[in-house]
UniProtKB/Swiss-Prot annotation:
Taxonomic superkingdom: Bacteria
Biological process, per Gene Ontology: translation
Subunit structure, as described in the record: Part of the 30S ribosomal subunit. Interacts with proteins S7 and S18. Binds to IF-3.
Function comment: Located on the platform of the 30S subunit, it bridges several disparate RNA helices of the 16S rRNA. Forms part of the Shine-Dalgarno cleft in the 70S ribosome.
The organism's taxonomic lineage, starting at the top: Bacteria, Pseudomonadati, Pseudomonadota, Alphaproteobacteria, Hyphomicrobiales
Membership in a protein family: Belongs to the universal ribosomal protein uS11 family.
Alphabetically ordered keywords of this record: Ribonucleoprotein, Ribosomal protein, RNA-binding, rRNA-binding
HAMAP family: Ribosomal_uS11
Identification of the protein by name: Small ribosomal subunit protein uS11
A GO term from the CC aspect: ribonucleoprotein complex
């Protein structure tokens, strides 16, 4: 018997005017997720999904390319204004933020939501190069 043709599921176009951009910049990668006010994901991208591998993922340029990609996806849903939440110590924080502003979004607020331990887990060993 012939296989049933697999259906390609299209993203339905939502009309959301404003949202929250979560920029998570680690030492190895930068992920950017755009959500609505309730926290439902609308679009996401990362340096890894944009084709960067290894140490190139942690560069500011990779974060910029990922931010341009996610902004294109979010603007298809009619998004115009963003609140930006930046987390992590990585080098892609500022460049991702600049790329979001350059893509035509109105950034209403920028918050640093990096978690800081109150002397929690023991850190990993010192790196000797």
């Amino acid at each position: 018997m012939a296989k049933e043709a697999t259906r390609v599921r299209r993203r339905e176009r939502k009309n959301i005017a404003s949202g929250v951009a979560h920029v998570n910049s680690s030492f190895n990668n930068t992920t950017i997720t755009i959500t609505d006010a309730q926290g439902n994901t609308i679009a996401w991208s990362s340096a890894g999904t944009m084709g960067f591998k290894g140490s190139r993922k942690s560069t500011p340029y990779a974060a910029q390319v990922a931010a341009e990609d996610v902004s294109k996806k979010a603007q298809e849903h009619g998004m115009r204004t963003l609140e930006v939440e930046v987390a992590g110590p990585g080098s892609g924080r500022e460049s991702a933020l600049r790329a979001l502003q350059a893509a035509g979004f109105t950034v209403t607020s920028i918050r640093d939501v990096t978690t800081i331990p109150h002397n929690g887990c023991r850190p990993r060993k010192r790196r000797r190069v």
